[in-house]
Amino acid sequence: MAALPEPVMQGSADTAAPLTPPNGRPYQPVVTLNGWTTPWRMNAGVKEFHLVAEPVVREVAPGFFVNMWGYNGQSPGPTIEVVEGDKVRIFVTNRLPESTTIHWHGQRLPNGMDGVGGLNQPHIPPGKTFVYEFEARRPGTFMYHPHSDEMVQMAMGMMGLWITHPKTAHPLIDKVQRDYAFLLSAYAVEPGTMTPRINEMTDFNIWTFNSRAFPAISPLVARQGDKVRIRVGNLTMTNHPIHIHGHEFEVTGTDGGPIPKSARWPEVTTDVAVGQMRQVEFMADEPGDWAFHCHKSHHTMGAMG
């Protein structure tokens, strides 16, 4: 096997600038809220990525640090951006104290690449590297997470976003001036501690956008008149009614792909269920500082928005 691509690590919880594609087919990059997009290496026409599963420390709010598990130095891990039809190869190195896998949530791919440990692939032991390889078949917003000791590993923050851009102009995917993406995640961290309770299923006390809590969440910035797209994935254990102030949006995409325009309608709140992705779009035509948050009050206070 050729030498692995060097893993690119990230130490900051700030929102990184969008990654302009240095090679391969062009696309309009997204901005991952309080996150970043990982670079790739081109190898004989294949986009190669290297994810490292490892313990990390995430600054959830200024001065509030939490022991998590993630990828490439952060939780959530880096966003992966590709173009429809790209052949991709992802090297996954395990630096955790237990076995892991990665499931490419929502993707169409060969069964042996689906990442369910003990079903269609062996678990990746500590210190070992597994290689996933498949074609990005359809455009959309997807997620990745372990299917190995899920209760522990997802409670510790192991998750990330995957975005497949359309290869050509798509009749259901409009051009936008602002394109944001983030994951909903939740943790149970007792006062005076730094490590989440991994067996918690209901009583979470830290509700976050991309593992950041208000007021540490970066703003979604737009100029008046911009068309804005926001992609929201939910890997918590409960639904989240995501609500915008001062504007109406349309839900334009789901995990299954773009929604026909005849099936869209304006609203100000959309429920994002467990394991779902929702893509909303709106015109930023009202100037001001507007709230965007989960409308479950204890989540808003927790502080998810």
Over which residues does each language-model region extend?
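Copper-binding active sites and cupredoxin-like electron-transfer domains
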Residues: 1-305
